[in-house]
A protein has these predicted regions:
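Short histidine-centered beta-strand/loop micro-motifs
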Residues: 28-34, 50-51, 58-60, 77-79
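Short, conserved beta-strand element in jelly-roll/cupin
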Residues: 34-49
Length: 91
């Protein structure tokens, strides 16, 4: 999985979501804007993170494994049981 570039800095984060409150848009393919990176940070539980392009890659995220979202790359998530997480955006 990619790492955040050293030059990007966090500028906002989402509220904490659970399996019951995750926005439906995150469950379907979507992407960040040009120049916007993000980290999916798990507080509790497991989240399935799928990168849809250029090749499909699925990663199980937990407290030790954070998901890195590259700019303009299609991706989606799926809760695996009970989960709490948030997303931190950087540019």
């Amino acid at each position: 999985m990619k790492q955040l570039p050293e030059h990007v800095k966090p500028y906002k984060k989402t509220p904490e979501f659970t399996q019951a409150t995750v926005p439906k848009g995150l469950l379907n393919d979507h992407q960040t804007k040009d120049g916007v990176w993000a980290k999916i940070i798990i507080v509790e539980g497991v989240l399935k993170y799928t990168i849809s392009e250029p090749d499909i890659e699925t990663i199980m995220l937990d407290k030790e494994t954070r998901g890195v979202i590259e700019p303009q790359v299609l991706h989606h998530i799926a809760p695996v049981g009970n989960v709490r997480f948030f997303i931190e955006f950087s540019r």
